[in-house]
A protein has these predicted regions:
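Bacterial N-terminal signal peptides
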Residues: 3-15
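Short, structured secondary-structure elements
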Residues: 19-267
Length: 267
């Protein structure tokens, strides 16, 4: 299934519907470093681009942040919480040249990291504990997908693997039962989110669910909308109505609900 999905997605980014003129679909190009007046301020190549914009505004770059500021930024960015007084004092008294790197490694190894940054992906995946519409019934296993996302971040799972598991985790080979279960839980990406479960037309309910799944997949993995092509060739993004139903046919092979009737239950 995943191979067919990828093949179909390749058709979406084609030379039709103005794709050649849209900046988002243009090939990535190497850029020369801009010339700056105070190059000694830079440490990385990206700094040249930042500094160039600063100098365009006749401004001056800020001074390097203090260690106290750095540790607060690191904790708030990676854990979402400020450091304790003891943690601040320990970092300030650490004179080792790699103290900053050690701090970052420590924060990344904490389960708080996955809880903090997994939330961003859960927003992309439209996560909720209920379906969020009409009857607003509870999704009894949604929490398993939430924990899967948090665990994936904490394990530093490769992003390509993260994508595959959420689209076709049940079809992947597994070394043991634990891995099989983890991969299958990744499919929660397709089952969570708003779904009209009180629809009295089973066929329409199923097709509406597929439309919602495809729209979310397009936004999450392609940075583009797909839903408009359900009724007509997309007016902006490079996807035709033919492409839409070619991809929808693949999703028709999946089973999201135990039964497609009022009120439906999750599979």
């Amino acid at each position: 299934m995943f191979g067919r999905i990828i093949s179909c997605l390749g058709l979406l980014i084609g030379p039709h519907l103005g794709a050649e003129t849209e900046w988002a679909y243009a090939p990535v190009e190497n850029s020369e470093l801009p010339k700056v007046d105070t190059a000694d301020w830079t440490r990385e190549e990206m700094d040249f681009f930042v500094l160039a914009e600063i100098e365009k505004r006749d401004d001056l770059p800020t001074k390097p942040a203090t260690k106290r500021t750095l540790i607060r930024r690191a904790y708030l960015d990676l854990h979402g919480l400020p450091p304790s007084t003891g943690q601040i004092e320990a970092f300030l008294s650490d004179e080792r040249p790699d103290a900053w790197g050690r701090l970052i490694d420590e924060l990344l190894q904490s389960p708080r990291y996955g809880e903090r940054w997994g939330r961003h992906w859960l927003d992309v995946a439209r996560y909720a504990d209920t379906n969020g519409m009409d009857e607003d019934i509870a999704h009894p296993s949604a929490w398993r997908y939430r924990d899967y996302v948090i665990s994936s971040f904490n394990k530093d799972k490769p992003f390509d693997r993260f994508i595959v598991e959420q689209l076709a985790g049940d079809l992947l080979p597994a070394k043991d039962l634990a891995q099989k279960r983890e991969q299958t839980v990744g499919l929660g990406f397709l089952s969570v989110g708003p779904k009209m479960l009180a629809c009295d037309d089973p066929d329409k309910m199923r097709r509406d669910i597929i439309d919602e799944q495809m729209d979310t997949m397009g936004r999450a993995f392609l940075g583009m909308t797909i839903g408009c092509a359900r009724c007509h060739d997309h007016k902006i993004d490079p996807i035709s109505i033919k492409d839409y139903y070619g991809l929808a046919g693949i999703f028709m092979s999946t089973k999201t609900l135990t039964k497609y009737s009022v009120v439906a239950e999750f599979h």
